Design a protein with these regions (language model features):
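Cys-dependent protein tyrosine phosphatase-like superfamily
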Residues: 1-99, 111-202
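Ser/Thr-glycine-rich phosphate-binding loops at phosphate-binding pockets of nucleotides
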Residues: 104, 108-109
Length: 202
């Protein structure tokens, strides 16, 4: 209830939920009926295989970290239709102020928000610093077997800055810049980009 009151005080009009149907069923959103809920659930490619390896006890901490770096690269490049959807929903009526979230709040949400912040002109170092805060705001997510290596689980559930840096490096390597990525891959026009900046930047 305190969280709902906080959302009301912030004037939140929309919630963007990147969780799949089973994830939403386990922990439904509890928001004011007047708040619009927009659902675009997806699982990052490679996640099921990674979680299976962890739960089998076959993924070492070092392998888990390497897998996460690769996952973040793929997360940036393989799910562009979802990022384009977020941008355009934000520009729609009552699209903002908004909250965007997933299950743990650092992977799908982290990359989505980072790309959005870079699109509206926030400096890369500030974006990485913002992401790092997620590491200290995490809540336990019960999705691992009891015999999974705890150190490997910690690597997967951590919000290490180099994870997000890997995603941004992949975008820059593939497209030259985030601006080119947004234009060529997400199809955002300069007018839409300016509108997003006006909407989100004070």
């Amino acid at each position: 209830d305190a969280d709902r009151q906080r959302l009301q005080a912030l004037g939140i009009r929309s919630v963007y939920d990147l969780r799949t149907e089973p994830e939403r069923a386990r922990a439904p959103n509890r928001v004011d009926p007047l708040v619009l809920q927009h659902v675009r659930g997806f699982i990052p490619r490679g996640n099921p295989e990674m979680f299976a390896a962890v739960n089998a006890g076959s993924l070492t901490p070092a392998a888990a970290r390497a897998t996460m770096l690769e996952q973040y690269e793929r997360l940036a490049l393989d799910h562009t239709e979802h990022y384009a959807w977020i941008y355009r929903r934000l520009l729609a009526k009552d699209g903002a102020p908004a909250i965007l979230h997933c299950a743990s709040g650092k992977d799908r949400t982290g990359v989505s928000v980072a790309l959005l912040l870079l699109t509206v002109g926030v400096e890369r170092d500030e974006v990485l610093e913002d992401y790092a805060i997620s590491h200290y705001q995490r809540r336990p997510v019960d999705m691992f077997a009891s015999h999974a290596l705890r150190e490997a689980v910690d690597e997967i559930m951590s919000a290490h800055v180099d994870y997000l840096a890997a995603a941004l490096n992949a975008v820059e390597r593939e497209f030259g810049s985030v601006e080119a990525f947004v234009t060529r891959c997400l199809g955002l026009t300069s007018t839409e980009r300016d509108a997003l900046t006006a909407l989100l930047v004070e």
